């Protein structure tokens, strides 16, 4: 996705700056996701799964990981190189062999993919799992969406 953020002078409306919207959007989106985890996820949530390894996934690792006392963070990604770079940011991070493996052990699942088909199946989710989906509309299967509260 491409975008820009324009900053204008509040007094006279002059354009002060044009910025790449990617990093700003990633941080804003991750902040809202972190708020949802802080307010809605079970208090005893200890295992976080992040699916994806792009700019949104990196921002979500930074924003969501501090919201709970996560003892483990599992990273699921189609491309292991970027996921490995993410894992090096936090000693709690582990690379998962699959999306399913990451999801089945998680109390909180954050989906940040551009998948064109589901990467989360309802039957993989533990009871009470909090799911955040910020990527494509296809990340979650229909049963996960229908079963959400």
Regions found by a protein language model. Name each.
Residues 1-45:
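Phosphate/diphosphate ligand-binding glycine-rich loop within oxidoreductases
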Residues 40-47, 69, 126-127:
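Short helix-loop-beta connector
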Residues 52-54:
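Glycine-rich Rossmann-fold phosphate-binding loop(s) that bind the pyrophosphate
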Residues 57-58:
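N-terminal Rossmann-fold NAD(P) dinucleotide-binding loop
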Residues 66-90:
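NAD(P)-binding Rossmann-fold cofactor-contacting core
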Residues 91-106, 122:
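Short acidic low-complexity segments
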Residues 113-115, 135-136:
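Short glycine-/small-residue-rich Rossmann-like dinucleotide-binding loops
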Residues 125-129, 134-149:
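Rossmann-fold NAD(P)-binding glycine/threonine-rich loop
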């Amino acid at each position: 996705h491409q975008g820009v953020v324009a900053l204008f002078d509040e007094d006279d409306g002059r354009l002060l700056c044009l910025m790449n919207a990617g990093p700003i959007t990633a941080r804003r989106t991750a902040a809202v996701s972190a708020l949802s985890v802080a307010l809605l996820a079970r208090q005893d949530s200890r295992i976080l799964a992040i699916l994806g390894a792009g700019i949104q996934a990196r921002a979500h690792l930074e924003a969501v990981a501090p919201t709970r006392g996560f003892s483990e963070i599992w990273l699921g990604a189609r491309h292991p190189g970027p996921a490995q770079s993410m894992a090096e940011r936090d000693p709690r991070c582990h690379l998962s062999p699959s999306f399913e493996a990451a999801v089945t052990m998680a109390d909180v699942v954050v989906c940040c993919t551009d998948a064109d088909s589901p990467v989360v199946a309802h039957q993989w989710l533990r009871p009470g799992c909090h799911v955040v989906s910020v990527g494509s509309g296809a990340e979650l299967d229909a049963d996960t969406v229908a079963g959400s509260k």
